[in-house]
Structures are given as C-alpha cells and as structure tokens.
Amino acid sequence: MTVNINELVKEHGFCVVPTEEKPFSLDEARFNFLAYLEDYPKMGFSFVKVANELVELRRKQEVYRLFGQCFLGAFVIGEEEQVFLLCNQEGREVFQESRVYVNSSLHTFVSSYSLFLSSIFLLKAKFYEMKQDEVEEIAANLKDQVLSLEKPLEQELPFWEHMAYLIEDDGIVLRDDLFHILNKEQ
C-alpha cells in the first residue's frame, strides 16, 4: 500500500509517530484480519497486509493507526478500535466532514468491505444484461447486510451508504479504461 503520508500530515495536521518493529507472533499471523483485505486499485482501495505495517498518526489527543486508503481518503483505526475515514479533498466534498465513521471494528470493516467487493463482482458478472432494478437490489442488499453487521447500530454509516449510492448510480469502476490499457502496452 502506498499512501502519501505528507498529504495526510499537511491536510489534517497529524504527525507520524515512529513505531518499533516487533516480531510477528504465530497468533498474530493466524488472526490477522488485515490479510483478508483485497486491494481494488480501480477505485484506489489498498491496504496494509500485516499489523507491523500500520502507521501511527497523532494530533493533539487523537491517535489513529493507518491501515488503508481509497479514492475518498485514508482508513484508520481509532483508540476505541473503531474504523474511520480521514477524508481527502474529494471525501470532504462528498461527506462535508474531515473524518467519517465507517465501522465499529476492524473485524466488521473486513466483513463490510468483503460484501462491497462481492457487490462489485455481481455487477461485473452481468454488466452486459443487468437492468436498473437489479442494480438497485444489489445496492439495497449491500446496505442491509452492512447494517446487520453493526447490531446494535450506534452510528449512521455514511461511507457504506455512499458506496451503495455509487452502485445504484453507476459510479463503481468495473474495468480498466481503454486509455489505461493502451498506456500499459507501450
């Protein structure tokens, strides 16, 4: 995963805290939720794969551990293990916030993100014959499934609601564009 840390520091006023590298234990390897997160570069989703790659960010009393990013900003784990999105410029335009609640835990984020990816692959499976009501059903199912993971629902889930909206509104990138493919060939 490549995140422009300088951009995060400049935009949000964080400082990066150097972390001490620790050996990876067998239990950490067995229960490593980060390893389940698949990158989806078509929409800028990328993640660290092991806990010792987490980057600690501090600002006044706030402490976060950076573990991923997407086209809307950086995914971080807060002090109470909740997942937030620290919004970049595009994310701030969408959410009108600099920080957005995403999920109650990394475990729930992994499940939610996996459901999101499965929705993308459902769209890909029938892209040439899918009707709008089927697309809307995929978006509604994503919202319902993510909401069911967050029982009891403590906060709204604007990030996942926006992902469902993008599915409905044909805002999900399903393939590499021709320009990208041609540039790769040269």
Regions found by a protein language model. Name each.
Residues 51, 93, 97-100, 133, ...:
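Generic preference for well-ordered secondary structure
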Residues 114, 118-158:
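An amphipathic alpha-helical core segment
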